[in-house]
């Protein structure tokens, strides 16, 4: 069985499937204008498949507001997943705002500033 660290290939496949299903369900089933545009970045499952950390980014809304709405709808999304996935245990969903994109943008700006400063010093 292929493993990445201590994550099995089944864990990775199920994580990907949950991410795809949730992305579709959030777009089609949750009709809350306060939510904005949610993009699911990744899903991380515990080894026993009991819990899933769902990492998301959001445009057009505050991350805290989006997280609160997703947390409120987690039970509903869980029940929809149960109907779609046909597996014995559907993990409990835990939504987390993914700040890695913001950090990457910030780091890119710092690198660009450093390069601009270096270019001025070289002149």
Curated annotation (Swiss-Prot):
Transmembrane portions of the chain: none
InterPro entries (UniProt xref): KH_dom-like_a/b, RbfA, RbfA_dom_sf
GO function terms (MF aspect): ribosomal small subunit binding
Cellular compartments annotated: Cytoplasm
Single biological process term from Gene Ontology: maturation of SSU-rRNA
Domain of life: Bacteria
Family: Belongs to the RbfA family.
Subunit structure: Monomer. Binds 30S ribosomal subunits, but not 50S ribosomal subunits or 70S ribosomes.
Function summary: One of several proteins that assist in the late maturation steps of the functional core of the 30S ribosomal subunit. Associates with free 30S ribosomal subunits (but not with 30S subunits that are part of 70S ribosomes or polysomes). Required for efficient processing of 16S rRNA. May interact with the 5'-terminal helix region of 16S rRNA.
Protein name, per record: Ribosome-binding factor A
Organism: Cupriavidus metallidurans (strain ATCC 43123 / DSM 2839 / NBRC 102507 / CH34)
């Amino acid at each position: 069985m292929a493993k990445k660290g201590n994550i099995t290939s089944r864990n990775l496949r199920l994580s990907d499937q949950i991410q795809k299903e949730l992305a579709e369900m959030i777009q089609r089933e949750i009709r809350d204008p306060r939510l904005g545009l949610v993009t699911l970045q990744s899903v991380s499952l515990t080894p026993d498949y009991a819990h899933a950390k769902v990492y998301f980014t959001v445009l057009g809304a505050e991350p805290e507001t989006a997280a609160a709405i997703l947390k409120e709808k987690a039970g509903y999304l869980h029940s929809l997943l149960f109907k779609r996935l046909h597996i014995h245990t559907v993990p409990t969903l835990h939504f987390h705002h993914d700040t890695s994109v913001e950090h990457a943008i910030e780091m890119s700006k710092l690198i660009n500033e450093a390069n601009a400063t270096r270019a001025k010093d070289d002149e």
